[in-house]
Amino acid sequence: MKFNTKALALACAIVWGLAMLVTGLANLIWPSYGQHFLQTMSSVYPGYHATRSLAEVVVGTLYGALDGLIGGAVFAWLYNQFC
């Protein structure tokens, strides 16, 4: 059985983008929520800073979606190559 590469890439993009969005929005409401996670992501994604602003939440969401898209596509491609 092979993975549909586009479907898995899109699913991973949605999940990781939503994870970044929800964590960022929760951090705007409750300042200590997810702070360590967001600081870790700011060290991974260039141009993203873990400051409490809506613009940074949008940037983090876009980075998360792009990261999930690429990661999901690479995972599905590798899986299909070896199975």
Spans of model-derived segments:
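Juxtamembrane/disordered regions of integral membrane proteins
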Residues: 1-83
